[in-house]
């Protein structure tokens, strides 16, 4: 009996030893680790990497309300509610802090992903040259857009090297200080302009949330408008010029002198967007309008004759008037979801959903 017991104990100890040996054999856990070359020579993995760069536009970088189920319609600043009511009020009044939105970290994660993509996409030969150019332009747009989101919230921010940072470097080498507001805007402007060269004017329905040429040029114009505004382009009599916002060397990060050229440049950039060619009276974008009708249907009343002002009321839409449109339905359709995203001539860039918190 004792021999049987010893034999049983021996077998159990051997089994445990084998199991422990398997546990300690860590080689199998490294089989799933892939090099950048492995990722960017595989088409599916390449697209997954770009999708991950996009992903940080959600979460903490979604800034308004929580209308999660209305992805095809807009909502104006009048509407907010649900379980994010207090958070949205905080955003509206500018009283939020980093405990409310951790977009700093998420944005720089997206910037890193996009930069790596830009540096490595050219090694993938499974795409045509045109496809690679589009994908690289998307990543360039996304990276510049993260910087734009950061600039709006934090003011002057650190601009990282395009090739990234070596995390094994000393802290002093990794601690990139803020660039000036003008430097940030110039970077965003140049990157958006470069991205616009290879982005298409339109996207297919299944790619409606990807940036177009108009999206890049519009973000560029917005950044230039912010740079031209009093916050960074003060007139002599402006009381607060943010002169105490300086870098480690004491250089002021905000412009201290008014420059009229900034407004001219912003206006020209906005015009670049407005004059993009398209199928809306020769333009890519225009205000959505619904034709007037005298037929009433459930939920859709007949057109109420608009105010007769003797000018616009006598002209058609193409002539700059409103005699042949339904003003009420033209406005309502944009907000109630009856107008799909891809059909909306006003839509320049969307993240694929209307509003939404996490």
Task: Give the predicted meaning of each segment.
Residues 1-31:
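Bacterial Sec-dependent N-terminal signal peptides
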Residues 21-84, 157, 214, 225-358:
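An aromatic- and glycine-enriched ligand-binding surface/loop that stacks and positions planar moieties
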Residues 38-61, 65, 80-154, 171-208:
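Conserved, well-structured interaction surfaces
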Residues 156-163, 196-206, 281-288:
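Glycine- and aromatic-rich loop/turn segments at beta-sheet edges
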Residues 161-166, 192, 227-229:
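Short, small-residue-rich loop/turn micro-motifs
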Residues 162-168, 240-243:
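Short, conserved phosphate-binding/catalytic loop or strand-edge motifs used
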Residues 209-219, 223:
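Amphipathic alpha-helical protein-interaction segments enriched in hydrophobic
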